[in-house]
């Protein structure tokens, strides 16, 4: 979606409802059921129902309304949000050592997202399909196969883009939230006593009465706020105000009414705990509700998949993941992308999770650790931005951080109890992604430093070539260079082996700035280094895709005429070998070699015609 000025506020707000709130909007399917299912040692008791409802409501108020919508969303990079954006903002005005710590926090947060994203589609779709147990109990054996079929279709359509079906997301999700509100209100009217749980003292009473068990039960309460990171991550698509407006006018009232409606039902009929959401509906509405619930969970899953694609692109462009094929599925919207490798790896992981856990209640045990871990990191990073970038009073910032952590840390600690019952899954996946990202970044830096150790001066080499030129051949040669003031390896090897040089030489560097977009005015910088040498530096934001043809067009506008099909592109292709290392660094080196072999080649990254590319190999020890 785009927040084009021509779009009206209601249209953008409706679109935000369709995308941003899919995950948190489907939480009523399973949250209260997991809270009161008996796993914590108490059943459907009045004090327990009131306590859980009070905790859920005030978590929605404090975590979503105050922390994320009011505070965290103030931290934006040209309107964009997300944990990696927060990481880069926090590290702008800090020491090198502090910046390194903040980068590690940001990468852990991003890794947690990868771990949690495998569970979200599985638990959402399964919890909707489990409505079959109410409609037709004899079909309960079909829950797993039907869940896999639905998700298979969802992952298959990713390559075609979601622009067409995406237009339906907003009205479907608006209908979903209105149904949530209607079902809840109907039940509350029948038993208005449940509204007493709006009083936060019921949450306090819950802790005093149930003591240690109540603390462990926070691991189930947190299910009500899963998906809260999407509010911040999708800020660039819709803007702050539409996301806030959607929350306070539609989403929060609907969620509150539905949770309290389920509570009212349970007070009246404790046996409804087997599936309080679907049992809110009259019998005639069960099948339509099952259908709309399935659609809502598919939309929630789609939002998560799109989020993975966006995070992966950002990590690739910032140098934390190896280059991979990224396909744009819309000519109008740069945010609509498809990454085949990520799509099918995620699909395989989701199917394995569904087959292994078999029921959404089992998956709920795996849910929450990564979410609450990311919440802790977001609190630290966002308050760092408030102190270092906004220059807020340090004591005021400290109070904000303490308030956030007083909620985040108990939630995270309570979820650690899930570690053996399924919480190991997102943590394991997150750990793998953290190792991959830190390995690629550190080993890539080591490789570039090794390649540039020759220490030859670019200016001195150009002066020498102009003074005593080798044989010059007609045409233009472009040498891709990762660093601005370093002699490209391909140039040195071409002179060493071929002993010729083109009449015109362009040293081209494509760099990614710490911003989502770069204005066209700043896209290309051209510097003539000598009569036959030019340096071209093209800058892109991490939401943009570098394109050499566009760079040539910009060069032509500034007086350096280049024609793609009359230009030879020289690139170096490194053959890497591992030097002597300790065993743990050797393992990391082998992982890097694997990533390097499977990385997208530079000509494919920058859309250079293959018949214009000349690759010169070189062996480098790292």
Curated annotation (Swiss-Prot):
It is found in: Cell inner membrane. It catalyses: K(+)(in) + H(+)(in) = K(+)(out) + H(+)(out). The keyword Cytoplasm does not apply. It is a multi-pass membrane protein. Pfam families: K_trans, K_trans_C. Signal peptide: none annotated. GO terms for cellular component: plasma membrane. InterPro entries: K+_transporter (IPR003855), K_trans_C (IPR053952), K_trans_N (IPR053951), Kup (IPR023051). Keywords: Cell inner membrane, Cell membrane, Ion transport, Membrane, Potassium, Potassium transport, Symport, Transmembrane, Transmembrane helix, Transport. Responsible for the low-affinity transport of potassium into the cell. Likely operates as a K(+):H(+) symporter. This is Low affinity potassium transport system protein Kup. It comes from Escherichia coli O6:K15:H31 (strain 536 / UPEC).
């Amino acid at each position: 979606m785009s927040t084009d000025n021509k779009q009206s506020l209601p249209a953008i707000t409706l679109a935000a409802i369709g995308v941003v709130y899919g995950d948190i909007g489907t939480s009523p399917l399973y949250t209260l059921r997991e809270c009161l299912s008996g796993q914590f040692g108490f059943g459907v008791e009045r004090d327990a129902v009131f306590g859980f409802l009070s905790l859920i409501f005030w978590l929605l108020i404090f975590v979503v309304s105050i922390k994320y919508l009011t505070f965290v969303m103030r931290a934006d990079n040209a309107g964009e949000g997300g944990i990696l954006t927060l990481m880069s903002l926090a590290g702008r005005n800090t020491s090198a050592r502090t910046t390194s710590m903040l980068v590690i926090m940001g990468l852990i947060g991003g890794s947690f997202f990868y771990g949690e994203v495998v569970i979200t589609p599985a638990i959402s779709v399964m919890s909707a399909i489990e409505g079959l147990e109410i409609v037709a109990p004899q079909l309960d054996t079909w829950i797993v196969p039907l869940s896999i079929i639905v998700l298979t279709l969802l992952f298959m359509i990713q390559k075609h883009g979601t622009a067409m079906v995406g237009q339906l997301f907003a009205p479907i999700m608006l209908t979903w939230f209105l149904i949530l509100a209607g079902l809840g209100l109907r039940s509350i009217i029948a038993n208005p006593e449940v509204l007493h749980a709006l009083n936060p003292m019921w949450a306090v009473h819950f802790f005093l009465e149930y003591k240690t068990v109540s603390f462990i039960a926070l691991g189930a309460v947190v299910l009500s706020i899963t998906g809260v990171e999407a509010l911040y991550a999708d800020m660039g698509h819709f803007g702050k105000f539409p996301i806030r407006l959607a929350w306070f006018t539609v989403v929060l009232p609907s969620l509150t009414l539905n949770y309290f409606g389920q509570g009212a039902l349970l007070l009246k009929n404790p046996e409804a705990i087997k599936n309080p959401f679907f049992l809110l509906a009259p019998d005639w509405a069960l099948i339509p509700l099952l259908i709309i619930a399935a659609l809502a969970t598919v939309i929630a899953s789609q939002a998560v998949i799109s989020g993975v694609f966006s995070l992966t692109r950002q990590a690739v462009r910032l140098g934390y993941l190896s280059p991979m094929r990224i396909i744009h599925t819309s000519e109008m919207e740069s945010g609509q992308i498809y990454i085949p490798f990520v799509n099918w790896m995620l699909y395989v992981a989701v199917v394995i999770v569904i087959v292994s856990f078999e029921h959404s209640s089992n998956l709920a045990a795996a849910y929450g650790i990564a979410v609450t871990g990311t919440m802790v990191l977001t609190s630290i990073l966002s308050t760092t931005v408030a102190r270092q970038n906004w220059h807020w009073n340090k004591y005021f910032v400290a109070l904000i951080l303490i308030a956030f952590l007083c909620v985040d840390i108990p939630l995270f600690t309570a979820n650690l109890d899930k570690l053996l019952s399924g919480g190991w899954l997102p943590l394991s996946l997150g750990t793998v992604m953290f190792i991959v990202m830190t390995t690629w970044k550190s080993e890539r830096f080591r490789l570039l430093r090794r390649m540039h150790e020759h220490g030859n001066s670019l200016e001195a080499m150009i002066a020498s070539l102009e003074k005593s030129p080798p044989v010059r051949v007609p045409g233009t040669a472009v040498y891709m260079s990762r660093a601005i003031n370093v002699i490209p390896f391909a140039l040195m090897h071409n002179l060493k082996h071929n002993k010729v040089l083109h009449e015109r030489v362009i040293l081209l560097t494509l760099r990614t700035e710490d911003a989502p977009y770069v204005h066209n005015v700043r896209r290309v910088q051209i510097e003539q280094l000598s009569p036959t040498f030019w340096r071209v530096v093209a800058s892109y934001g991490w939401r943009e895709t570098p394109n050499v043809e566009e760079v040539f067009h910009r060069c032509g506008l500034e007086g350096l005429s280049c024609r793609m099909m009359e230009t030879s592109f020289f690139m170096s292709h490194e053959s890497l070998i591992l030097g002597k290392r300790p065993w743990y660094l050797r393992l990391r080196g082998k992982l890097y070699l694997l990533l390097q072999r499977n990385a997208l080649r530079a000509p494919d990254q920058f859309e250079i015609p293959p018949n214009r590319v000349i690759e010169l190999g070189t062996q480098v020890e790292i």
